[in-house]
Structure formats: C-alpha cells, structure tokens
Amino acid sequence: METKIDNSFFLEILEFAKEILEIPSPSGYTNNIIIHLVNICKENKYKYEVLNNGNLLIEVKGLDNYVVGLTCHVDTLGAMVSAINSDGTLKFSVVGGPILPTYDGEYCTIYTRFGKSVTGTFLSNAPAIHVHKEARTLPRNEETMHIRLDELVHNKKDVLDLGICNGDFIALDPKTQITPSGFIKSRFLDDKLSVAIVFKLLEYLAKEKTAPKHTLKIVISTLEEVGSGASYMPKIDEMLAIDMGCVGNHLEGNEEKVSICAKDSSGPYNYDMTTKLIELAKKEKLDYAVDVFPYYSSDVSAALKGGNNIKGALIGSGVAASHGMERTHLNGVTNTFKLLLAYILN
C-alpha cells in the first residue's frame, strides 16, 4: 500500500538537513551537533542517551520486544592542523576520505581547543595562474596544499599567537543550497541528510501516535567517516543503516531513487533483510534501485567487524559526486523515507 504524506513534509526534511549542515562536525569534533540533537530530543521528550563513544542513542518502544537498530552518521569529512609553516600558512591532515582536489579553493574554519575560530582557504602550493607555471597541473594532495589564514600572519609565531596549534580541527563551508527544482546540493549530505530523514521519522511517529512493529534503537554515530562509528552497538537483533546511495557508471541508482545496497567493499548485506526491503519497495510502489557499491562501507560493516551479533542491511537516497560537492533530489529523499517507514511498521 502506497504511503500518503503531504509533499511539504518532505521539503521540511531538506530544511532540517540544511539546519544541521550548518553545524560543523568533522569526525572527532561532533560535540556541538550532538548537543543540538540532544536538545531536540529533550524538546520532544524522546528517550535518549549519549554513549561514551560520543554516539547518540534514541529508543522508541515498539509493539514487541524484538529490537531493530537504525543507524546514520552525523560526522563528516574535514581536516586537522598538522604543522604551522614558517610563512604563517598551515599544513593539514585530512579527516576521512575526501576527493582532495575538490578542497582546492574552499573556505574553511579552524577551531582552536580554547574556543576561538579563524577562517581560511584551502589552496594548492601553486595557487596563482599569473605566477606559477604548474598552477593547472600540480597534483592536489596533503604535500602540495596548504591553508591560507584570514589574519595578518607572516610567520609561525604569529599563528601561535592566534591560539592555533597542531591538532586543531578544520571544517569546510558546506555551501548548502536547496533549489526550486527540488535538489539539495551541499558537502556532507553523506550523511546529515539521513540524520534529517531519521529525525523526521521520529516526528512522524509521535505526531501520528504510531508505534513501530519492533522496538527501535537509533544510533546517530560520530566516527563513521573514519571507520569506527557503530563498532559498538547496544543489544539489538538486526540493524539498518541509512546512508547515501551511490550514483554513477553502471549503477542503477540515481538522485531520485532510494538505493538498496546488496553488497559493498565489506561484503554482502543480509540476504533476508535485503530481500524484505526490495519487497517493501515494490509494495509501496517506490522508485528504487538495487546496487553493488564498489568502494564503500557503512556503520553495519563497522558493527559486524566490532563483533556485534546482528544481521544488517543498507539503504539511502542516491547522492551524486559523493565526498565532493554532493547533490540529491527531493524524490530520492521521499522514496527513502517511505521505505524506512514501511520497514519499521512491517
């Protein structure tokens, strides 16, 4: 049976995604975004707990005691100060696995450990076409790039006097836009878009006074981009990751579909769960794709490697240009939400 929900509800998902995309949260620097989500939990009287590893756990009582885990991650790619150069620029080490050439020319903010923030720009070491012969051809990597600070600094001491030191986190401007045609384009849709979908699911259940078939334990993980996000899970029976779907080459997924991942780099997802998701997508008349993601792993992968006795599956809205300037469409978000809702109610 097709789920009927007003289109304005799905537009609200995009707006909430934009809201949380504005809160910097590279892996390892997620306290502020978790505090923001905790405040939402308090306002809506959701049962929650912040775990020692920084993850946020939200519990929703179901019609029985079988426990389904849902997970999505709020951490993003970013960088960290690795050295201060003699000319007052910064060397950096990436956090996660970005397409580093896309960092070239991007605005960023350095967050010191003592409450100060300083803006800057990622640049190649040959940034000026009128000066550097290799401006177009120089490879973009950690050794050939730097950060130019928006302060009057001329040497290492000037930078230290600003309070910047090695180990400070660097967040990129996500540049989020929602277009009249229904696209949302931004860095870090992977995976703040899924966080927005899950929080709107919580809102929907509360508003409709609807209980899921099984008890839900929802984990908002904070270290997925570095591989350990859901390596610890509370006691659950099965686990569904809501993360970005892959788009490109021979894959069937696109920005308007919900992707159901049958296998990724870490191996196949649970056969029965994946089959059930496909059946539900058909029953709900959703626009969906089943794909094998060639260079990918998820919080389900981390949970299994962490020794959790679970079965797991993966779905998500198709996201183009992943780990770069990402984009998806309202239709993909709608299909993902409807599949997630059908999954927890059936």
Positions of PLM-derived features:
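N-terminal hydrophobic/helix-forming segments and targeting peptides
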Residues: 1-346
